[in-house]
Structure formats: C-alpha cells, structure tokens
Amino acid sequence: MPIAFEDVAPVVPVRDLQAALERYRRLGFEVRAYGHGTGYGYAQRGTVSIHLSEWDEHDPKRTGAVVYLYVSDADAVRAEWASCGVEGRLGEIRNTDYGMREFGFVDSDGTLHRVGSKLP
C-alpha cells in the first residue's frame, strides 16, 4: 500500500509569539500557544494550520516565509483582512494567468501570505 501524505503545516518564524498570535486572531484564526514559554504556537482556520516559532534572531528583512492559502472566496478574505486593522502590506486582488483570483499580504514578521480562490 502506498504511503499517503495527509496534511502540511508550514512553520513560520516570528519575533514575538504573543504579538503574532494576536495578529492571526485578528485575521480570523483560532490561536493558541504550545505550553508555557516554549515560543511555539498555532494559528488555525478551518482545516488550515500555520505553526509559529519565536526566533530571537529573526530579521524580517533577511529571513521570511511564504504560505499560499487556498480559500473559497479570496475577495471576501481580502475585505475581511482590510477591515481588521492588522499592520502589514495588503496587495490588490487580481486574476492570474494560472486560474486563480488572489492577493498578497506581508505581515510585520515578513511572512508573505498569498491567498487565492479558483476562478470559475
């Protein structure tokens, strides 16, 4: 029987775990820290999970991460994120040549979140 890969969870570096958990909470994720003082936490929305790892040496200008979030309605997510007041760079939404409607959001830790839904 072939081995099945069942899920993936990116681990992104953050400078301050508590600040990152609050940011993801404001973006609509359920968040929690793992243990006390471990510098590790989770942000989950639906079946999507992003792991957060506090890293003292993290420099958003030199190290970063990219996650692609497949969603049912990228326009609705962009509108939601635009209204939540989270610090970062929110890009315009656009249709791509590869059949997605997507936008990008770079948070204060330098993580690029590309968010897209399939074009009809």
Where on the chain are the PLM-derived regions?
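Active-site beta-strand termini and strand-to-loop segments that position acidic
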Residues: 42-48, 105-108, 118
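Vicinal oxygen chelate
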Residues: 15-18, 67-112
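Core segments of cupin and vicinal oxygen chelate
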Residues: 11-49
